From Swiss-Prot:
Domain YcgL: 1-84
Leader peptide range in chain numbering: none
Gene3D superfamilies hit by this protein: YcgL domain (3.10.510.20)
Source taxon at top rank: Bacteria
Transmembrane segments: none
Protein name, per record: YcgL domain-containing protein VF_1703
């Protein structure tokens, strides 16, 4: 399965995976408004590939079910809480 990956212009670290290049029809308008203008990153074959931050099987399942996958950045690390637990 090939997919196109776009990064957000409004939320750093957010990426949108869609099946067909420049076909944002499956993505809800509210999400597109929050995502901003998508910037193309790459087209990738998901078969037999590992992704850096997400499980490739979850990406493929979401694209098949919803037509897209939204990758959000991990939550910021709370260093104060880590320090308190020492």
């Amino acid at each position: 399965m090939f997919c196109s990956i776009y990064k957000s212009t409004k939320k750093q670290g957010a990426y949108l995976y869609i099946e067909k290049k420049d076909d944002f029809a499956p993505v809800p308008q509210e999400l597109m408004a929050m995502f901003g203008t998508p910037t193309m990153v790459m087209v990738v074959n998901l078969e037999g590939r590992k992704l850096a931050s997400v499980d490739v099987e979850k990406v493929k399942a979401a694209i098949k079910e919803n037509g897209f996958f939204l990758q959000l950045p991990p939550p910021p690390e709370n260093l104060l809480e880590k320090y308190k637990k020492r």
